[in-house]
Amino acid sequence: MSVADQMALIKRGAVEILVEKELEEKLEKSAKTGVPLKIKAGFDPTAPDLHLGHTVLLHKMRQFQQLGHEVIFLIGDFTGMIGDPTGKSETRKALSREDVLRNAETYKEQVFKILDPEKTRVAFNSEWLAKLDAGGMIGLAAKYTVARMLERDDFGKRFANQLPISIHEFLYPLIQGYDSVALQADVELGGTDQKFNLLVGRELQREWGQTPQTVITMPLLEGLDGVNKMSKSLGNYIGINEPADEIFGKIMSISDELMLRYYELLSDLSMAEIDGMRTGIRDGSVHPMEAKKQLGREVVARYHGAAAATDAEEHFVKRFRDNQTPDEMPELTLAATDEKVALCRLLAEAGLVKSNSEGRRAIQQGGVKVNGEKVSDESLELAATGVYVIQFGKRRFARITFA
């Protein structure tokens, strides 16, 4: 494949390539010498399950594998114990070594549903970071100033608002950057929220006399609410280890616009095919539900196999036929919180009933369903995260999104 064709594939879905000309030169050199580029992406095992948001990077890594390059799946077992402060307004709670290692094992099992195990190097950053003594850590810290760290948006805001910033949080970008030095990475992939850290890696490589890595930032996949990035803590995620029926059903619940976004970042369809689908939805020649089914089949098949994808679609169609959930319904957006909210209250706020007491009676009488499942507990409380489709009677629906 020509360098131009490689660049076209690499650029798909990417937000930024720093520096694009450098990447072209690296690809040209690789083609001439036959030496593959080292492509690095790091994942801190702070939770046991990967979700579709993580797979945006994994799909880009797979594309590099298909182009013949070496992919390094870096598990941040050392940095995971620090906790990435990116985007946080307060210091994150550190995980124990045992928690990190347990989560890391599940990561290794899950990533090979996407990556080719024969072409993937799995590395743990404790291999080199645990060997850094006090002198080495001080030497690393000397490479950057506090003023430069405060240029990072989240640190700057916390400092301006007189919120505490722990010293170890300043070390995180340096340690992540040092990973690139240890691996001699040619390219590092990361979400747009990681741009500062990725650029630190470039600077540290220059300090160590290495060719600076090319940085490719990928978008943060929106969760089911279409607003916030996909996150387990927000409840708006699709885990790749979830049952096939749940994955398919969640994909069918997203908006049409978000569906097209998922196609671009998660599917193997070409951009021309996706653009054709977008046009078809606009002119009415493509029904959005059929397009979502196609996406659901592709995603489920990737993680559970083609047979499971077919079964999941059939299960959804039967449930949809029985429930007759409409495409259009009243929508209500509420603030996501850590608290739970009573279902009877949601019925009233969505305008499906006139009062909380009427909502409780409706639940008692078996006239209420949540996401297609009938409920009978009048005291039921729901987590104030994610998306719920609430049905009252046969024809009254509301979609409630916590964002």
Curated annotation (Swiss-Prot):
It is an enzyme of class 6 (ligase). The keyword Ligase applies. SMART domains: S4. One of its GO terms (biological process) is tyrosyl-tRNA aminoacylation. Catalyzes the attachment of tyrosine to tRNA(Tyr) in a two-step reaction: tyrosine is first activated by ATP to form Tyr-AMP and then transferred to the acceptor end of tRNA(Tyr). HAMAP family: Tyr_tRNA_synth_type2 (MF_02007). This is Tyrosine--tRNA ligase. It comes from Geobacter sulfurreducens (strain ATCC 51573 / DSM 12127 / PCA). The gene is tyrS.
